[in-house]
């Protein structure tokens, strides 16, 4: 009995070591399972540079009141009569059908000609994009137009380096497989060839000449709407592009183009005429009944 009593602390110690080992081993396995998601549960990788607090709460403004603009100065904004052009029913039908026909020809074109494009045309399509509605009319967009050969090539280098990582590591097998039929990869030759690159930045908040910040409500939605109008303006001008969302390239491109910290890259559009040998996938659009619900 005395021997058993003397051995009891030893048994307890050994038992504690075994339990501790088993617990630690189970934690290690659980950690590995979390770090390596299966193909079934993997989700498309998200651009972390765009993950910011775009909606400023009242509490945030109260805590940092001195840093933010007082909007009471704009309360007496004058209002003016609005009288748009009105068309007859037949004119409305004709204009809407012709515009649809024009836009239905729009395609994502990755084969772009180096043929020069008049700068005035680019000015006009950017000006048109700037007519988009925005939260509280903050117009939270910046369109950086690049035509310099060296800068375009540096942009290509940055994007291709990150895109190769995206395709091989971040995007996941399902995303990569879904893109195979479109024959896309991380090589972006059009970034060198296109006469212009338009980089669209959203302004997470505004910065006034006084240094104070201005709240930009729904800035990403507002800038996305302006991108849609920009695509329509390019199509109307007879130009082509392909919508490019260079994941994880925002900080490097922002630095290259010397943009402030409040601007986040949302989209990049190479712009020009289609190459003479340009090809696009033979895709069909959804029928009206598949995209519209009438209540």
Curated annotation (Swiss-Prot):
GO BP term (any one): tyrosine metabolic process
Location of region: Disordered: 29-81
The protein's Enzyme Commission number: 1.21.1.1
Domain of life: Eukaryota
InterPro entries (UniProt xref): Nitroreductase (IPR029479), Nitroreductase-like (IPR000415), Nitroreductase/BluB (IPR050627)
Mode of membrane association: Single-pass membrane protein
Membrane-spanning intervals of the chain: 3-23
Listed GO MF terms: FMN binding; iodotyrosine deiodinase activity; oxidoreductase activity
SUPFAM superfamilies linked: FMN-dependent nitroreductase-like
Reported function: Catalyzes the dehalogenation of halotyrosines such as 3,5-diiodo-L-tyrosine. Likely to also catalyze the dehalogenation of other halotyrosines such as 3-bromo-L-tyrosine, 3-chloro-L-tyrosine and 3-iodo-L-tyrosine.
Record protein name field: Iodotyrosine deiodinase
Native species: Danio rerio (Zebrafish)
Taxonomic classification: Eukaryota, Metazoa, Chordata, Craniata, Vertebrata
């Amino acid at each position: 009995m005395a021997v058993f009593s003397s051995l009891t602390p030893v048994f307890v110690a050994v038992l504690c070591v075994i339990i501790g080992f088993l617990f630690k081993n189970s934690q290690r396995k659980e950690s590995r399972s979390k770090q390596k998601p299966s193909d079934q549960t993997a989700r498309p990788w998200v651009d972390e540079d765009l993950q910011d607090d775009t909606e400023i709460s009242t509490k945030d403004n109260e805590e940092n009141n001195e840093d933010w603009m007082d909007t009471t100065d704009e309360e007496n904004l004058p209002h003016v009569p609005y009288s748009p052009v009105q068309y007859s029913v037949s004119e409305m039908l004709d204009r809407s059908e012709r515009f649809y026909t024009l836009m239905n020809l729009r395609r994502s074109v990755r084969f772009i000609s180096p043929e020069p494009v008049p700068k005035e045309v680019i000015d006009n399509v950017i000006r048109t994009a700037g007519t988009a509605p925005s939260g509280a009319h903050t117009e939270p967009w910046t369109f950086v137009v690049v035509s310099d050969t060296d800068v375009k090539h540096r942009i290509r280098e940055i994007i291709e380096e990150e895109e190769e990582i995206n395709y091989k590591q971040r995007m996941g097998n399902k995303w990569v497989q879904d893109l195979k039929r479109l024959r896309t990869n991380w090589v972006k030759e059009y970034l060198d060839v296109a006469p212009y690159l338009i980089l669209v930045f959203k302004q997470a908040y505004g910065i006034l000449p006084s240094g104070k910040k201005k709240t930009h409500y729904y800035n990403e939605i507002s800038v996305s709407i302006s991108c849609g109008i920009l695509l329509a303006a390019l199509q109307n001008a007879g130009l082509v592009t392909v919508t490019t969302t260079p994941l994880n390239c925002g900080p490097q491109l922002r630095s290259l183009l010397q943009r402030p910290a409040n601007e986040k890259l949302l989209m990049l559009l190479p712009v020009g005429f289609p190459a003479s040998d340009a090809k696009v996938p033979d895709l069909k659009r959804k029928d009206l009944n598949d995209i519209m619900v009438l209540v």
